From Swiss-Prot:
Protein family according to the UniProt entry: Belongs to the ATPase B chain family.
Organism for this UniProt entry: Desulfitobacterium hafniense (strain Y51)
TM spans (from-to): 4-24
Official protein name in the record: ATP synthase subunit b
Domain of life: Bacteria
SUPFAM superfamilies for this protein: F1F0 ATP synthase subunit B, membrane domain
UniProt entry keywords in alphabetical sequence: ATP synthesis, Cell membrane, CF(0), Hydrogen ion transport, Ion transport, Membrane, Transmembrane, Transmembrane helix, Transport
Amino acid sequence: MNPIHFDLTLVVQVLSFLLLVYILRRFAWNPLINMMEERRSQIEANIANAEKERLQAEQIKREYQEEMRKARQEAQEVIAKATKLSEQRAAEILAAAHGEAEKIKQSALADIERERDRAIAQVQAQVADLSVAVAEKIIRKNLDVRGQEDMIEQFIQEVGELPC
């Protein structure tokens, strides 16, 4: 073999390769580029859809949080209103109870006053009866001073035994 020898197989291989590149470029390159372009468009569309869905999800989340905030606020308002109402009702009940207690107290004081007056009237009547009885006895007996003192002493003891 001669080092300068020209090998035909090499030329055929180079020509075959160039022919293959030409055929691929002519028939496969455009479909391959189109397929890659479609894939890129599809990926971009998927990314855009994902971003759109993410934005929608964030909007839904904000709406949900706003609804929850409103619900909490309404619940707090209902609780505050119920608390205020119960405090008012408790104050009304307490005022009514104080009023009723005052009525009962006044009634009891009036009853006590009437009973005291009645007892005083009874004692006065009994004292009057006893005074008349003593005077009657004194007049009947026409006693001496010593007898009168004994009679007065007995009268004082009888008055002391009376219920008040």
